[in-house]
Structure formats: structure tokens, C-alpha cells
Amino acid sequence: VWIVHDVSSQKDLSLSARDFLIGAVFAQTEPGFHTEALKAQAVIARTNALYERSRKPDSQTYDFIIDTDRYLSESQARERFGDRYEAYRKKIEQAVDAVGSKYMVYRNRPILAPFFFLCAGKTEAAEAVWGQKVAYLQSTESAGDLLAPAAESRLCFSADRFREVVLSRFPKAELENLSAEILSRTDAGTVKGIEIGNLTMTGQEFRALFQLPSADFDIVFDEQQTEIRCYGQG
């Protein structure tokens, strides 16, 4: 039994590992995905739960915190998925039961297991995202992600709208002649630095500014519009 602290109710709850994992898979991925994806998510959820339990201070009464991004109760899942709930639950239960008590370790300890929706063919190293090396979170090929329909997306803005978005955050920007230069990328393709007019910002800042699905992108300007091409999600 795991003791979890529910952010919404501010109460500590007792959950079996199996019940937590079912609710975690409901919350953390799309239940309509392939069963293998649900199995992977169940392993990730167990790994992260054990990682947090192993690091909690002695004075803490609960094992870890939950919210609706991390776990859905039965009533919350029913509300979110409606008529699809029963079929999804059966599918998730099968995935959770199939992986049993598997979890990921490094040097015999549970790892921190971050995840994302799609990469652009190569995952990112922890150092490129957090600025800190993590021995087991290294960049690796993931070519299968490129087969997904959502692997590439495009957003178009008029020149005026593009300027408006940038100026809302950087009112002193000089954008009379729209231009952009990507200054550097990580090995996985994520933009590290970009120059727009007289501005220099990080790829993550640009992503947040335009609410992009990814910081791996290209920008194309023409007389009519600005097109941002994004690769991957998350």
C-alpha cells in the first residue's frame, strides 16, 4: 500500500500499487494508444513512484504527491472518458498486469523517469534540458517517433501578428525587418539560441512565447506570413 497526498483534496490517501498505476496510466497517456505504449507508461509510473518514495524525508507522512496530471481516480476517469471508460479500463488493467512489478533502475536504485509525447527522431540528454548531467538520461535514436502523424506541425502567423506576440514579451524589440537566425542546436536538434531582429533568446523562451509543442523548430519568413515548423511534442 502506498500513501499519497492528493493536492486537490489536501488529504492523504491509501492506494494499492495496482490501483495507483491504473489511475496513473489514465492520467499520463492516452488510453487509446497501443497496448505497448500503455505498458511502458505503467513501468514509468511505478519507477517514478519508487524513486520518490526512496527520497522522501523521514518526517514526511506520505510517499509522494498526486494531482490530475499524475493520477485519475475512478470517478475522475469516468468523467473524462465517458462511454469509453470501461473499454479503456480493461485495456489499462491488462497493460498494468502484463508488466507486473517491473521498474527501471540505475546502480540498483529506481531512476527518475521523465517522459514526453514525441521526439523528432532523437531524444534529448538531461544536460541539454536541465543543465545538469544525469548518467542514465542520455540522447538516443528514436526513429519510430517520426512515423507518428503528430511528428511535425506547422503554425502560421501574419507578419503583424508575429511582431505583436514578440513585442508583448519584449516591448523594445526592433522588428521592422523580420528575420530570424537559429544560433545553435543541441545534438538532438532542440534550438538552444535564436536571434530575432535585435533580440537573442533561448529556444525554450521562444517555444513558450509562441506556445509551440516543441523547441525543435525552423522559421520561414515570406512577404505574406511567418511559418514555424515544429518537430516532435514535449
Regions found by a protein language model. Give the residues of each.
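Conserved, single-site charged/polar hotspot
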Residues: V1-G234
